[in-house]
From Swiss-Prot:
Domain of life of the source: Viruses
Record keyword Repeat present: no
Function: Forms an icosahedral capsid with a T=7 symmetry and a 50 nm diameter. The capsid is composed of 72 pentamers linked to each other by disulfide bonds and associated with L2 proteins. Binds to heparan sulfate proteoglycans on cell surface of basal layer keratinocytes to provide initial virion attachment. This binding mediates a conformational change in the virus capsid that facilitates efficient infection. The virion enters the host cell via endocytosis. During virus trafficking, L1 protein dissociates from the viral DNA and the genomic DNA is released to the host nucleus.
Region of interest called Disordered, as start-end residue ranges on this chain: 476-503
Record key words, sorted: Capsid protein, Disulfide bond, Host nucleus, Host-virus interaction, Late protein, T=7 icosahedral capsid protein, Viral attachment to host cell, Viral penetration into host cytoplasm, Virion, Virus endocytosis by host, Virus entry into host cell
Bias (Low complexity) ranges: 484-493
Protein name as catalogued: Major capsid protein L1
Locations listed in the record: Virion; Host nucleus
Family listed: Belongs to the papillomaviridae L1 protein family.
GO BP annotations, alphabetical order: endocytosis involved in viral entry into host cell; virion attachment to host cell
Gene field: L1
């Protein structure tokens, strides 16, 4: 006999619905008006390994290395205060204008080259690739002068908010955990904003070397007291609104050139079950098992360049399809294929000695970089419905403040006092304090500011990137100036005479 019974399994309840993230194409209307904007030649020069502080009358020399991030903060004009070719383009009562980045080209000057980095006191115990007998790990200074050609990187990230980077740093120790001096600290993956001048991953890992390497000699001197960051592609790709990364270009390559081990007491001893004890000196106890490799970026070539090329943004990887919120754009660049360091020598003695005497000369090293930024912006408009304004306010409330949206108070009919002289001791102190200027949310971060507020042009055919865009988009050039040549009166009269004769 069949008997029906209820299911013993748990009842499935659907998840609570969440608010849907809207793509910018759903509430942004693109117009057919395009503008070109380009920077001037952007130059920077300094010492490739460290900054030199002020000493006496000498000015400070900054640290400028090819292994630093260049984060350009591009300031754009407010399109709502822009002189438009068509005044009937939008209704300022119900609409607002924004910029959309549709084309970009990052130009790089200077020749291709490889710049070395290193440390005059590098912690190198043994050459573990070609070693015959291990060196006894005694309390002797085995540091040596070692130079390397770092990992080769080309990178370009475009977004309207600063890029994010990740690195390993010291984590938090639990309260119930007992630690002793010299123990390995817990590690934590830290995500932070990438600033201009931050060091990239040069092949030794993305970590806080200041806090995690007490010897100050395990890596080259340009990163021994720095934090190397690697772009947090996973977090930027998962950004809710897609503002930090519209798209990115990346090319990395390296190989291991030399293999060393580190001098010092090994914190985590090798278990005796993993080897058979030796008898000779250097084999019992075993020497250092802390191995590391020096990176090499290998050959640089013009066939694998990401820069000096135009890129067109048709569809961004996130929900923001190139809209420049806040009238700003962040361009993050790395290019180690032009890392040549300039060596400069000066005569310090009264005259040059013969034969050659090295102490008569001083040696200096500098590194210079050259950039140029070019953009194509499309003018767009947003219809300010209730849903759109609520969505933008949830994303970034300062956008509506920049659009001058707020509560308008009704005019008052009461009589108010207005003093003529207010900044003197005879007049009572005024209650109304001066308005506080708007705080920049990124003022505590360091960026390379590029002002393009007065460098917009609608004549695309006057600029190289503009002509490339017109060819790509199929836009016709404007007709040439001038009037058509009128037909001469003599030719017309002679034609009439010929017609009469034929009759």
């Amino acid at each position: 006999m069949a008997l029906w019974r209820t299911s013993d399994s748990k009842v499935y309840l659907p998840p609570t619905p969440v608010s849907r993230v809207v793509n910018t194409d759903e509430y942004v209307t693109r117009t057919g008006i395009y503008y070109y904007a380009g920077s001037s030649r952007l130059l920077t020069l300094g010492h490739p390994y460290f900054s030199i502080p002020k000493t006496g009358q000498k000015a400070e020399i900054p640290k400028v290395s090819a292994y630093q991030y260049r984060v350009f903060r591009v300031h754009l004009p407010d399109p709502n205060k822009f002189g438009l070719p068509d005044p009937q383009l939008y209704n300022p009562d119900t609409e607002r204008l924004v910029w959309a980045c549709v084309g970009v080209e990052v130009g790089r000057g200077q020749p291709l080259g490889i710049g070395l980095s290193g440390h005059p006191l590098f912690n190198k115990l043994d050459d573990t690739e070609n070693s015959h007998l291990a060196t006894v790990n005694a309390d002797t200074d085995n540091r040596d002068n070692v130079s390397v050609d770092n990992k080769q990187t080309q990178l370009c990230i475009i977004g309207c908010t600063p890029p994010l980077g990740e690195h390993w740093g010291i984590g938090t120790i639990c309260k119930n955990t007992q630690t002793q001096r010299g123990d390995c600290p817990p590690l934590e993956l830290i995500s932070s904003i990438i600033e201009d001048g931050d060091m990239i991953d040069t092949g030794f890992g993305a970590m806080d070397f200041t806090a995690l390497q007490a010897t100050k000699s395990d890596v080259p001197i340009d990163i021994s007291q720095s934090t190397c960051k690697y772009p947090d592609y996973l977090k930027m790709s998962a950004d809710t609104y897609g503002n930090s990364m519209f798209f990115f270009l990346r090319r990395e390559q390296l190989f291991a050139r030399h293999f060393y081990n580190k001098a010092g007491a090994v914190g985590d001893a090798i278990p005796t079950t993993l080897y058979i004890k030796g008898a000779e000196s250097g084999r019992e106890p075993p020497t250092s098992s802390i191995y590391s490799a020096t990176p090499s970026g290998s050959m640089v070539t013009s066939d694998a360049q990401l820069f000096n090329k135009p890129y067109w943004l048709q569809r961004a990887q996130g929900h923001n399809n190139g809209i420049c919120w806040g009238n700003q754009l962040f361009v993050t660049c790395v290019d180690t294929t032009r890392s040549t360091n300039l060596t400069i020598s000066t005569l310090s003695a009264a005259s040059a000695s013969t034969p050659f005497k090295p102490s008569d000369y001083k040696q200096f090293i500098r590194h210079g970089e050259e950039y140029e930024l070019q953009f194509i912006f499309q003018l767009c408009k947003i219809t300010l419905t209730t849903d759109v304004m609520a969505y933008i306010h949830l994303m970034n409330a300062s956008i509506l403040e920049d659009w001058n949206f707020g509560l308008t108070l009704p005019p008052t009919a009461s009589l108010e006092d207005a003093y003529r002289f207010i900044k003197n001791s005879a007049t009572t102190c005024q209650r109304n304090a001066p308005p506080v200027p708007k705080e920049d949310p990124f003022q505590k971060f360091k960026f390379w500011d590029v002002d393009l507020k007065e460098k917009f042009s609608i004549d695309l055919d006057q600029f190289p990137l503009g002509r490339k865009f017109m060819l790509q988009a199929g836009i016709q050039r404007r007709p040439k100036l001038g009037t058509k040549r009128p037909l001469s009166s003599t030719s017309s009269s002679t034609k009439r005479k010929k017609r009469k004769l034929t009759k």
